[in-house]
Amino acid sequence: MVNKYVILLFAIIVLFIGGCSSAGSETGMLQGKVTIGPISPVERPGETPTIPCEVYEARKIMVYDERGNKLIQQIDIDCDGRYRAELKPGIYTIDINRIGIDSSTDVPQKVEIKSSTTVRLDIDIDTGIR
């Protein structure tokens, strides 16, 4: 009788450990750099203005299902313009939440996330300020 419980306990532990160890490898990474500009109507050639953190924080990277219909995740952009997120393997449509007249020729774009790999997507946002 004791042997049955020991075997059952051992089987449960093996299943639990096996389930935990494979979970980490079942995701991929999406990361990139966002550039935003211009941020003022007059920018002199050769000058690179400092982008305030609030400009990045107001925008998000939007991850939709493959068709672009269902929002899967919103990704924050840090004060240096970088973003990073773990996603399950699959095909996603990546876009931005547009503020005012923001535009980008880089998105929307489909990306394929594979297990244990990183996809890089850099996005240039034109604020439309002239």
PLM regions and their residue ranges:
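Bacterial signal peptide processing site
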Residues: 21-23
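A short, amphipathic beta-strand motif
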Residues: 28-36
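Glycine-centered loop-to-beta-strand initiation motif
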Residues: 32, 77-85, 123
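Short, acidic Ser/Thr/Gly-rich low-complexity loop/linker segments typical of extracellular
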Residues: 66-80
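A short, solvent-exposed beta-strand micro-motif common in secreted/extracellular proteins
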Residues: 90-100
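Structured interaction patches on ligand/partner-binding surfaces of diverse proteins
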Residues: 99-125
